[in-house]
Amino acid sequence: MTAAGTLSRIHQISMRTLDVDRAVRFYRDTLGLPFLFAFPPRLAFFDCGGVRLMLSTPEPGFDHPGSVLYFAVEDIGATHETLASRGVPFRTPPHKIATLADREVWLAEFEDTEGNTLALMSEPRLK
């Protein structure tokens, strides 16, 4: 277990795609990555050796050529508070983006000094 405000593990990497269905066929059928789940028509997820790969079509105003690093954290609220106190410029506070069968997915997005998007991600299990 790591202390709040300590980042130690990449959980997810986001890659932009223009055609999610075409990209799914490539990553699943050509590269052989295990398909996890999708939220059609914009998102598809794969397992890449324990790191999740998210393929997505860009939302207007959020289109950028780079990838997004998602850091896995246990307590997103405490980590957000610690990093914000260190001057990290958060775009969004911690917020729930999805409820899956067995867990919720929470994000808090921020930028590095070069304008690259990074995010904290927490997936607490439902009780």
Residue ranges of model-derived segments:
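N-terminal beta-strand motif that seeds the catalytic metal site of vicinal oxygen chelate
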Residues: 1-21, 67-69, 122-127
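Short amphipathic alpha-helices in soluble, non-transmembrane regions
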Residues: 29-30, 81-87
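Core segments of cupin and vicinal oxygen chelate
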Residues: 7-8, 14-53
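Short hydrophobic/aromatic beta-strand element in the GNAT-like acyltransferase core
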Residues: 52, 70, 107-109
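Short amphipathic alpha-helices within nucleic acid-binding modules
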Residues: 77-82, 116
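Conserved short beta-strand elements that form part of the metal-binding/catalytic scaffold
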Residues: 34-67, 117-123
